[in-house]
UniProtKB/Swiss-Prot annotation:
<dbReference type="GO" id="GO:0005576">
    <property type="term" value="C:extracellular region"/>
</dbReference>
<dbReference type="GO" id="GO:0045087">
    <property type="term" value="P:innate immune response"/>
</dbReference>
<dbReference type="GO" id="GO:0042742">
    <property type="term" value="P:defense response to bacterium"/>
</dbReference>
<keyword id="KW-0391">Immunity</keyword>
<keyword id="KW-0044">Antibiotic</keyword>
<comment type="subunit">
    <text>Monomer.</text>
</comment>
<dbReference type="GO" id="GO:0050832">
    <property type="term" value="P:defense response to fungus"/>
</dbReference>
<keyword id="KW-0929">Antimicrobial</keyword>
<protein>
    <recommendedName>
        <fullName>Psychimicin</fullName>
    </recommendedName>
</protein>
<keyword id="KW-1015">Disulfide bond</keyword>
<keyword id="KW-0399">Innate immunity</keyword>
<feature type="disulfide bond">
    <location>
        <begin position="25"/>
        <end position="42"/>
    </location>
</feature>
<dbReference type="GO" id="GO:0031640">
    <property type="term" value="P:killing of cells of another organism"/>
</dbReference>
<comment type="function">
    <text>Has antimicrobial activity. Is particularly active against fungi, and to a lesser extent against Gram-positive and Gram-negative bacteria.</text>
</comment>
<dbReference type="Pfam" id="PF08036">
    <property type="entry name" value="Antimicrobial_6"/>
</dbReference>
<keyword id="KW-0295">Fungicide</keyword>
<feature type="disulfide bond">
    <location>
        <begin position="14"/>
        <end position="36"/>
    </location>
</feature>
Length: 45
């Protein structure tokens, strides 16, 4: 099972700090950020 989900609106924070990336994921209803390879990927809750 893939627990990552693409969150395109968070792509713009990929160059920022990890806490900012986590916050963007949370703002979109996810747990925290996984990776920005190919765009923001957040872990599902």
């Amino acid at each position: 099972i893939n627990n990552w989900v693409r969150v395109p609106p968070c792509d713009q924070v990929c160059s920022r700090t990890n806490p900012e990336k986590d916050e963007c994921c949370r703002a979109h209803g996810h747990a925290f950020h996984a990776t920005c390879s190919g765009g923001m990927q957040c872990y599902r809750r």
